[in-house]
UniProtKB/Swiss-Prot annotation:
Residues 632-774, 859-899 form a coiled coil. PANTHER family: COILED-COIL DOMAIN-CONTAINING PROTEIN 33 (PTHR21623:SF2), SPERIOLIN-BINDING FACTOR (PTHR21623). CDD domains: C2. Residues 602-617, 907-920, 949-958 have a biased composition (Polar residues). Keywords: Coiled coil. One of its GO terms (cellular component) is peroxisome. Residues 602-628, 899-958 are annotated as: Disordered. This is Coiled-coil domain-containing protein 33. Gene3D superfamilies: C2 domain. It comes from Homo sapiens (Human).
Length: 958
């Protein structure tokens, strides 16, 4: 199955928006359902989560095999299967692998290609040789190919994809004709990390007498008896932690049948009150007299009752509910936090402990825990905590789980000599035989200084391909664990768990390997300089003197962490999570120290063996099984303590001399630095002056810029004010424009009136012509006179003086004729004047809005406008009066014409009486010529002839 790119039906941007895989922690569940190979042999599969486009992509990946605990690893190996018939499908025990991929492992940006690399390893090579890689397959994790499709909209509780399929294992060969070497069937699921789910039980474990429990009930009870991470008991209480390893030569049941044993641990108060205990181990898988349990149970008691309480261990048969053995250990004899590895021996009723049938042993480790760590005089720290994580690389030749024995030895050289001499106290796990009834409390005594340390046993680490322990060891300051010196070291011994089976479970065979971590003073100083916890983390501590090999044919390494505890009640013990936050020890320093240890290991062992070969071997044979506290032993212990003190004093002197040399070097460096600082002060002063000048110039520039900005702001404000004034002026001109339109309408009306006046003038002219014709007709003489040769005219005949004659030839009144002529001339002149002034008046009105340049001009124009309005009103009234007068005159003229036509003649005196009014009227008609020029909106020909109106107009103009 080759990867062909991201899903074609979902764009990369949309997929990134929906899924956002780079921001989430994802789980890949890959289960191998079956596997088959085309050739017979022993095979194993190695599964690795990797990103070939990124270097170190496996960092941060967590792995969980089957239902085990997760541990940091990006690859795992299945159990070994033997292919006898080619092509046959086989199943695996370690078949389910859950890879927890950290944030950023899966991305869809073209730079990441998360995949699962499956390799087929052939293990037919001799033991110790590297496995041969014969086949491989690639499973794309993310991005996915188009088939089967992934669900990018999946919620946290849903799977991105889940299906079953087959993978072909292609041969890992350069031959192009090579084909696949086998295939495997798998089931895969990919989803967001959900964390560990708590186990769901149908019913809680029953609390009752152990004799009434079924075989399954002790199994349920043992699940709640896992050891806690902390080493302290609850407040005002003490905890007795008992690890039941196994037993040999258990007695048979009363009916002679093989027992089906399990162990119940309780206190004497619980036994007295007939209380059931929850500290129950599991039941063996089959009836046996040599059971192996490996379970740890805890019993809590009140701290004030520790002097009167005993811990009781009962071996019970599950079928018969029969008590097989019972042991009672006084708690007051146990030293706090010291691990006791007991071989509990109980003789038969005959009391013959030397008989073979009487040797019934129960192997257990007992630790008494308090709510605080006791402080000892002369110790700066309470304890040293060691957290052992596991093997870093998968192993190729380890078939069984591994147990670890950890100890802190004060003198590593002497410890190597003891191991070379096969000293029982330095090899394996020292056993303390404890027979019952207990003969003396000295069996629980612990020496003040132990050359071999206080060894502690771990639980079996699995799986065999890559053991993982995640176990913490606590070493007290009383044992010398916190006194870092040149010879102190942490020693880890690795044993196969199969060496604990059989009739003698504590007869450990040759160790699989050993790891040594020197606890020197420099390491102590480095621990105290860290932040947070006073500890360090060692990533790769090698396993020396071992036949174990990794799948890369290299020596295996383990990861561990350690810290110093300075408080009686520490709050934080080391865990798999917080141990990662500790500072990592420099691998170069560690390799340098370990190289010296590796080189000196064989030399010291050989030399110590040759030196001690000349001594009599009787000393080893004469050592009793039970330790004796004799005077010579005490003297030897004191001598060793004095020797250690002398060595410490010498080491302190060496350190003091080294520190003095370092101080001299530091003083010289300080003096040199002061000289350099004195020389650099001048340059610094110059730099300061130049910087001040630059700062001053920059401040001046800033000031200019501020002034410029202020000026521009003022200009902007003025512009805004000018804009507001123009807007207000425009708003003020709107009503003036309306008034102007109104005035223009009035002018049009005046024009209409002018047209009417012109029409009246034409009518008057016609009437004058008709009147002249009539007058001429009337002025004709009678026919008699015609015969005399006098011509006839329509108008009166003119006399010698130029005046018209009457009908009878007499002269007409001079005043009447002059009045008519004057009125006619006046009307004609006024009409001509209006025609000449009409055009400039209109142009001047149209140009008025352009002259509004200021406030004072505006007020002047408004005043003139008011004056023009009043003038227009006066002219309109004059026009109306003139029209009425002209109408009356017209009517009078028409009446006279009719009277003349009818032959009515007015007496001469009547005409003379009217002459003054006519003269007055003629004088009034001459007055408009003396008026000033009118405004553009006025009409000059419509002025009234009355003198009061003239005075009013003159006063308004001034």
């Amino acid at each position: 199955m080759a990867f062909r790119g991201p899903e074609p039906w979902v764009s990369a941007s949309l997929l990134r928006q929906r899924l956002k895989a780079e921001e989430k922690t994802l789980d890949l569940e890959f289960e191998v359902l079956s596997v088959g190979f085309n050739e017979a042999g022993r095979y194993a599969l190695r599964l690795s989560a990797e990103n070939p486009l990124q270097v170190g992509s496996g960092a941060g990946v967590q792995l969980q095999v089957n239902d085990g605990d997760p541990f940091p690893a990006c690859s795992a190996i299945t159990d070994v299967i033997e292919q006898q018939e080619p092509g046959q499908s086989l199943t695996l025990t370690r078949s389910k692998f859950i890879f927890t991929l950290p944030k950023g492992f899966c991305k869809n940006d073209g730079q990441h290609d998360a995949q699962l690399h499956v390799e087929a390893l052939r293990l037919d090579e001799p033991l110790g040789r590297a496995a041969q890689r014969v086949g491989e397959a690639i499973f794309p994790i993310y991005p996915r190919p188009d088939q089967p499709r992934m669900n990018p909209k999946a919620q946290d509780h849903e799977d991105l994809y889940r299906y079953c399929g087959n993978l072909a294992l292609l041969r890992a060969s350069t031959d192009p004709t090579a084909r696949h070497c086998g295939s495997l069937a798998y089931s895969v699921a990919f989803h967001v990390h959900r964390g560990p789910q708590p186990p769901v039980s149908d019913s809680p474990p029953r609390a009752g007498q152990p004799e009434l429990m079924s075989p399954e009930e002790p199994l349920i009870a043992s699940q709640s008896t896992e050891p806690e991470i902390g080493h302290l008991s609850p407040s005002k209480k003490e905890t007795i932690m008992v690890t039941l390893h196994g037993a040999t030569n258990l007695p048979a049941c009363k009916d002679g049948s093989e027992p089906w044993p399990y162990v119940v641990v309780k206190s004497t108060s619980e036994e007295k009150n007939n209380q059931s205990s929850k500290a129950v181990t599991s039941v063996t898988s089959e009836p046996t007299r040599a059971p192996i349990w490996g379970d740890t149970v805890n019993v809590e008691i009140q701290a004030e009752d520790a002097g009167q309480e005993d811990v009781i261990l009962k071996v019970v048969d599950n079928r018969k509910k029969q008590e097989l053995l019972s042991y009672k250990i006084p708690i007051k004899y146990l030293r706090v936090f010291h691990p006791y590895h007991f071989e509990l021996v109980k003789p038969t009723e005959s009391g013959k402990a030397d008989e073979a049938t009487a040797k019934t042993q129960l192997y257990a480790t007992v630790v008494r825990k308090s709510s605080f760590i006791p402080r000892y005089i002369g110790c700066n720290h309470m304890a040293l905590e060691i957290f052992l994580r596991g093997v870093n690389e998968p192993l190729a030749n380890n078939p069984n789980p591994i147990v670890v024995i950890a100890r802190v030895v004060p003198n590593y050289k002497e410890f190597k000599v003891s191991q070379a001499n096969r000293d029982l106290a330095s090899v394996g796990l020292p056993i303390t035989p404890l027979s019952f009834p207990i003969p003396s409390m000295m069996n629980f005594d612990v020496p003040r200084v132990s050359q071999n340390g206080c060894p502690q046993l771990s639980k079996p680490g699995g799986p065999p391909e890559q053991p993982l322990w995640n176990q913490s060891f606590l070493f007290q300051g009383r044992d010398g664990a916190t006194s870092f010196s040149e010879d102190t070291a942490l020693v880890l011994e690795y044993y196969s768990s199969t060496s604990m089976k059989g009739s003698q479970p504590w007869t450990l065979n040759q160790p699989l390997g050993i790891s040594v971590l020197p606890l020197k003073s420099r390491l102590y100083q480095k621990m105290l300089t860290g932040k947070g916890l006073d500890g360090l983390h060692v990533e790769r501590l090698p396993i020396m003197d071992t036949s174990l090999k990794t799948i890369n044919d290299e020596a295996p390494t383990v990861a561990l962490s350690f810290q110093l505890l300075s408080s009686e009640r520490p709050e934080n013990f080391l865990t798999p999570n917080n141990s990662k936050a500790l500072p990592t020890l420099d691998p170069k320093i560690l390799d340098k120290k370990l190289r010296t240890i590796q080189e000196s290991w064989s030399k010291d062992t050989v030399s110590s063996t040759m030196d001690l070969s000349t001594s009599t071997p009787r000393e080893a044979e004469e050592e009793p099984l039970v330790p004796e506290m004799s005077h010579d032993t005490e003297m030897n212990n004191y001598r060793r303590a004095m020797q250690k003190m002398a060595e410490d004093i010498l080491s302190l002197r060496r350190q003091a001399s080294i520190l003095e040399g370092e101080n001299r070097i530091l003083r010289s460096r300080l003096a040199q630095q002061e000289e350099e600082e004195g020389q650099g002060k001048a340059s610094e002063a110059q730099n300061t002056v130049s910087m001040k000048q630059k700062l001053l110039l920059s401040e001046l520039d800033m000031k200019k810029l501020r002034d410029r900005v202020q000026h521009l702001q003022n200009e902007l404000i003025r512009k805004n004010d000018r804009e507001k004034e123009l807007l207000l002026l425009y708003q003020a001109q709107q009503p003036q424009a309306a008034l102007l339109k109104q005035y223009q309408g009035k002018l049009q009306k005046m024009k209409a009136l002018e047209e009417t006046v012109r029409h009246q003038e034409k009518v008057i002219e016609k009437m004058e012509r008709v009147l002249e014709d009539r007058l001429q007709d009337r002025s004709k003489p009678p026919p008699l006179n015609r015969q005399q040769g006098k011509p006839y005219t329509g108008f009166p005949m003119l006399s010698a003086s130029g005046l018209p004659l009457g009908s009878m030839g007499e002269n007409l009144p001079v005043e009447l004729y002059s009045v008519l002529l004057a009125e006619n001339a006046k009307l004609r002149t006024e009409l001509d004047k209006n025609r000449h002034q009409q055009a400039p008046i209109i142009l001047q009105q149209q140009a008025l809005p352009d002259l509004l340049s200021g406030t004072s001009d505006k007020f002047n124009l408004l005043a003139k406008l008011e004056h023009a309005q009043s003038r227009i009103l006066s002219l309109e009234s004059q026009l109306e009066d003139s029209a009425r007068r002209w109408g009356r005159e017209k009517q009078d003229l028409a009446t006279r014409l009719q009277e003349q036509e009818k032959g009515f003649r007015h007496p001469s005196n009547s005409i003379i009486i009217e002459q003054p009014s006519a003269l007055t009227h003629s004088m009034d008609l001459k007055q408009p010529s003396e008026l000033e020029p009118l405004l553009p909106s006025s009409d000059s020909k419509l002025n009234k002839p009355l003198s009061p109106q003239k005075e009013t107009a003159n006063s308004q103009q001034t």
